[in-house]
Amino acid sequence: MPGTLIIITAPSGAGKTTLVSGLLERDPQVNLSVSYTTREPRPGERDGREYHFVDVATFRALRDRGEFLEWAEVHGNYYATSKVWLKQQIATGRDILLEIDWQGAQQVRKSFPDAVGVFILPPSLEELEARLRGRGTDSDDVIMRRLLGARGEMRHVGEFDYVILNNDLQCALDDLVAVVRASRLRYANQHERHLQYFDFLEQD
């Protein structure tokens, strides 16, 4: 039985990384897809865990060989998803969580139309700016660029199946866990899990 692909998208600073970490702790059936990126690692990040950190030349070589399912440039850095790895994981029944931007989500859904799309919103742009400044890792120019990008990203919220407003971290995490559980109860998934039972029910 194939697994479920869950796409998580959010503007930088909306709390996506924290929510994803919480989901992985609460639901051991979910596995995180590790994307490729050319950005510098943040404090505490490790190559192969949060991302595969590569230089631009390596990224372009992988892209040109057709290794990526999708790729995008965000805030001057490249991000991409491994095509072969993702298809193998889904085929073997694993639920995979993919953290990508809205552009990447559009590309992925061409290959995985049944993927579940979740968009995480900050409570306001003012709160988003406060969170970005609270990180203490970005310059004012980078923060302003991220805020401008966030407004553009949030215009695509209507392209997603579920929207979570991250005003309270625990409530937002509960919502995300509920979305993942609900995705497993869709007809197509339940039919695959209980094929004989459903075939019996659908007999004339």
Swiss-Prot record:
Segments forming a coiled coil: none
Cited Gene3D superfamilies: Guanylate Kinase phosphate binding domain, P-loop containing nucleotide triphosphate hydrolases
Catalytic activity: GMP + ATP = GDP + ADP
Cellular localization per UniProt: Cytoplasm
Keyword terms of this UniProt record: ATP-binding, Cytoplasm, Kinase, Nucleotide-binding, Transferase
The protein's enzyme class: transferase
Domain Guanylate kinase-like stretches: 3-181
Keyword Cell division: no
Protein name listed in UniProt: Guanylate kinase
One Pfam family, short name: Guanylate_kin
Record-stated family: Belongs to the guanylate kinase family.
Gene Ontology, cellular component aspect: cytosol
EC number: 2.7.4.8
InterPro entries, A to Z: GK/Ca_channel_bsu (IPR008145), Guanylate_kin-like_dom (IPR008144), Guanylate_kinase (IPR017665), Guanylate_kinase_CS (IPR020590), P-loop_NTPase (IPR027417)
Listed SUPFAM superfamilies: P-loop containing nucleoside triphosphate hydrolases (SSF52540)
Positions of ATP binding: A10, P11, S12, G13, A14, G15, K16, T17
Family matches, as CDD domains: GMPK (cd00071)
